[in-house]
């Protein structure tokens, strides 16, 4: 899901980390923060490139609608990044960002699962995917609204659901081997990026409450993993957009 900025660390947590550790440890933590800032910049760049790569496809009537409107996905991510930056520099109430971020999860879930579902060739697998979409949407909505106990639970569930959908896509490929090379198919690269992103993100998201409360020195590592997973996803999206050129030739 275009990236949901789940690990926006509060200043109070950072102060607690800095007060607790020795100078060498603080230097290590600072190094992770610098790396995190670098990766965040790369993340910005890849998301923006992805947006422009796909918005160019919108007017191309020869492409299927799922590719033509895929620019909507990175556009929501860019919006969240802007809101996060405004929040960081106190130009925006952070509650606005938090709620926008949480409810954007519904868009990410619906858009990605829809994109994957329409690429499924096997009728039984597609029917299964459609049923899962109908069942899981209200579950995620309820978690967004009512979950107050377990931090990031709604994100964990959403990413696990997306992982299931990407797995269905790969099963479908094995059952219905494409005539073209996989590496020339835009959808393959897009869904591969979504798959890798989910695989990398699920463990740190699932452990986030434990880490934030008990091992705050590892927050930087978790943010690094998160940024890396999203960078890989957007690079895969860009590759998918470039593959559309072969479809037009």
Per-range role (PLM):
Residues 32-249:
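Terminal, non-globular segments
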Residues 6-8:
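Cysteine-centered motifs
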Residues 17-38:
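Short, strongly hydrophobic alpha-helical membrane anchors
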